[in-house]
Amino acid sequence: MNSFMTVGLGHYLAVAAVLLVLGIFGIFLNRKNVIVMLMSIELILLAVNLNMVAFSASLGDLAGQVFAMFILTVAAAEAAIGLAILVIYFRNRGSIQVEDVNLMKG
């Protein structure tokens, strides 16, 4: 096999670092839209999962890959619940801006 076409651990870590930085920038640069903030959190979780799978494959241990599947399942449930809460909030208030969420009454 040609060594030029192999993808090593460093490549996976670089992609995960880019995903992590994009997620962090998405949270800090866009503080107005809640949906964009949720997508940025999902990008951060995806970066963590990619790191876990890359290190697990590099070390030859399947435990990290199985744990990454559990994290993906929890992240999918978290996204579904978060979007359902946002839909209900939008129906009640007519907006999902972060400033409007901060003005909730108890």
Curated annotation (Swiss-Prot):
GO: which molecular function terms? Answer: NADH:ubiquinone reductase (non-electrogenic) activity; quinone binding
Enzymatic reactions: a quinone + NADH + 5 H(+)(in) = a quinol + NAD(+) + 4 H(+)(out)
Q: InterPro entries from the entry?
A: NADH_UbQ_OxRdtase_chain4L/K (IPR001133), NUOK/Mnh_C1-like (IPR039428)
Q: Which GO terms describe its cellular component?
A: NADH dehydrogenase complex; plasma membrane
Q: Which Gene3D superfamilies match?
A: 1.10.287.3510
Q: Where in the cell is it found?
A: Cell inner membrane
A family per Pfam:
Oxidored_q2
Q: Which residues cross the membrane?
A: 9-29, 35-55, 70-90
* Transmembrane among keywords: yes
Q: Does the keyword Transport apply?
A: yes
Keyword list (alphabetical) reads: Cell inner membrane, Cell membrane, Membrane, NAD, Quinone, Translocase, Transmembrane, Transmembrane helix, Transport, Ubiquinone
Question: What is the topology of this protein in the membrane according to its UniProt annotation?
Answer: Multi-pass membrane protein
GO biological process terms, semicolon-separated: ATP synthesis coupled electron transport
So what does this one do?
NDH-1 shuttles electrons from NADH, via FMN and iron-sulfur (Fe-S) centers, to quinones in the respiratory chain. The immediate electron acceptor for the enzyme in this species is believed to be ubiquinone. Couples the redox reaction to proton translocation (for every two electrons transferred, four hydrogen ions are translocated across the cytoplasmic membrane), and thus conserves the redox energy in a proton gradient.
Subunit text: NDH-1 is composed of 14 different subunits. Subunits NuoA, H, J, K, L, M, N constitute the membrane sector of the complex.
What the record says about family reads: Belongs to the complex I subunit 4L family.
Listed name of the protein: NADH-quinone oxidoreductase subunit K
Q: Which organism is it from?
A: Granulibacter bethesdensis (strain ATCC BAA-1260 / CGDNIH1)
Q: What is the lineage of its organism?
A: Bacteria, Pseudomonadati, Pseudomonadota, Alphaproteobacteria, Acetobacterales
This protein's encoding gene: nuoK
